[in-house]
């Protein structure tokens, strides 16, 4: 293979050509996490996984999540241990850009999302954060009218 197709039209899992990007979350309970992303965001569970090491695969809009329990080093990652984050020490988070933040806030809250705060204005956007059962945060944001990136 001399090149990888980046501008593809389909992002199925597993990919038939090119590649698909997924976000991996180390979780305490695979089924609980998969159900949260299904219920709150309308995700589609491709594989439910289990607590014995079989990961769950969830499609949310144009993104894939992989959820799996943590664990110690393995042959393919001999110096790495995976664990759920400490509740208030996060090094990365998922970002969801929406067209109507107030509607998303109300809908997702009614579906069980635990928001840290109500939507707040900041710079050229309105944003808020959801905390999932394992302590991950999910940023939800909407651009202000006339605000553009770049």
Regions found by a protein language model. Give the residues of each.
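Short, contiguous, helix-prone interaction/anchoring segments in small proteins
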Residues: 26, 32-35, 41, 47-49
């Amino acid at each position: 293979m001399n090149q990888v197709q980046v501008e593809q039209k389909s992002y199925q899992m597993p990919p038939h050509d090119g590649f698909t990007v997924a976000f991996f979350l180390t979780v305490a309970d695979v089924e609980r996490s998969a159900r949260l992303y299904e219920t709150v965001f309308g995700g589609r569970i491709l594989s439910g996984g289990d607590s014995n090491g079989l990961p769950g695969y969830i499609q949310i809009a144009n993104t894939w999540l992989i959820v799996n329990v943590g664990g110690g080093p393995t042959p393919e990652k001999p110096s790495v241990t995976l664990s759920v984050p400490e509740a208030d020490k996060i090094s990365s988070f998922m970002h969801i850009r929406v067209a109507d933040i107030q509607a998303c806030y109300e809908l997702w809250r009614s579906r069980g999302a635990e928001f840290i705060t109500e939507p707040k204005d900041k710079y050229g956007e309105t944003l808020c954060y959801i905390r999932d059962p394992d302590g991950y945060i999910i940023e939800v944001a909407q651009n202000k009218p006339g605000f553009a990136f770049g």
